[in-house]
Amino acid sequence: MYHKKYLKDKHSEWKFYLYTSWLINILLEFRNMYKQVSNSIEISVTPEYLAEQSIPEEYYHVWAYHVTIENLGVKPVTLKSRYWEIIDSNGKKQEVEGKGVIGKQPTIKPGDRFTYTSGTPLNSTSGIMSGSYKMESEDGNQFLAKIPSFSLDLPLPTKKLN
């Protein structure tokens, strides 16, 4: 039979373990998040290597990037177009421009967010992306919201214990 104090301590240990596990997962989730605020627009980007879509032996690597655009201003804004600059570790530069994102030109109200995921392939094991969105306020004024530069890196190899 266990002593009541032991059960209490065991319960506290378990709660501490759950809390630290939760905290570590949150920190790992956000360790690769890049943020930038410009013109009252906060842009957060989290890149993710897609091993299942990559073919390393053919020097073909694919990354997804998860983007959140938050309107910190007082007026609604519409995302009109995007501009990306992608540079791989071989120095090859690619520029991508187009209307909206993922086929949409979202209007984002003050305090609201728009989230989407897209991706890019590289013929090298790493690269860097940066860019901007052309935004338009409801009065027709256009301005740029800068996208933070972020790196596209292969995940660290994991060690097998057995």
Where are the language model's segments positioned?
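Hydrophobic core residues within well-ordered beta-strands of beta-rich domains
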Residues: 41, 61-63, 67, 114, ...
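Short acidic, flexible loop segments centered on an aromatic residue
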Residues: 76-94
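Terminal connector regions
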Residues: 123-162
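Intrinsically disordered, low-complexity Pro/Gly/Ser/Thr-rich segments with frequent PxxP/GP/PP motifs
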Residues: 96-124
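Short, solvent-exposed beta-strand/turn "edge" segments of beta-rich domains on protein surfaces
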Residues: 51-61, 74-75, 107-109, 122-124
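Asparagine-centered strand-capping/turn motif at beta-strand->loop junctions
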Residues: 69-73
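Low-complexity, acidic Ser/Thr/Pro/Gly-rich terminal tails and inter-domain linkers that flank the onset
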Residues: 33-59
